[in-house]
Amino acid sequence: MWTTRLDAAGIHDPQLRDDFTRQRSLVARYKPAAYLAVLLLLPRPLAPHMIAATAFMHHTDNLLDHGPLPERAAAYTAWEKEVRQALATGVSDHPVIRPLLHTGARHPRLLGHVREFLDTAATDLEFKGFATESDYQRYLDHYSLPAFLLVACLLAPGDEPAGYRAACRTYIDGSQRLDFVNDLAEDLADDRLTIPQDTLLSHGVTPADLRLSRDTPEVRALLRDLLHRARTTLAASHPVTDLVPPANRPFVRALIALEEATTAAATAKGPRLLTSSARPALPTLLKILLREHRNARRVRHSHTDTAG
């Protein structure tokens, strides 16, 4: 299955095929459901390029998130320099950057989004929490959206459709809100509080309530409200599907549906989110993927598979 996608994408060089395959393994561990969606739902020529962009985003995110701040800052500075040099010269010996450059040669808009992402990625490095909802919105614009556009630009090839960036922002707003609630246990363990202080105050919840996993009416109401915001925003993101080519729509629908299923699982879990994250049941995931796989097959039977 994977080798046919490399062939369809015109990736024949043995070193480059090995690089793409290594990044595939990284993405499969990082986001297994989304990885399956890439393989099952996207046109074969596009799948390796989505893997390359996702792997770059994840590698950068790991450098920003893990370890003491001085080490993270030094690692990101070195990484940014290496990536910018590769963008300037068109060559690299790094197994994450080589596939990115190859994908950028096929999808030139990606390289502009890589530069935009690098311009503001240190926002995550400098993260100290949000005082207000406005602070969260700035984080969304400076980090979450540029990161998502690394992959979203591949789903709408050619000139960017009118309204596409705004539609992507709506989706990533809902997705980020969900992640911040669903990852509370992990983030709190890393002394990282992602809920705005004014939101905590309005619900009468303290950071200690969350760190100590207190199951109180106030905490339950807070979690319900946060997940309601995520659910509402994800529901508003569905129009983005109409802005990508028909061959890519099953993947986009599945992406939103997987997030909505995770939101439902998190809602059912309630205050237990303070000790571990929620995941949709396997039958739910399979139902989403199989439904959109049928849709993808119908599209491919009615259109020539030329995306990529």
Model-derived segments and spans:
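Catalytic cores of Mg2+-dependent Asp-rich isoprenoid enzymes
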Residues: 1-175, 181-308
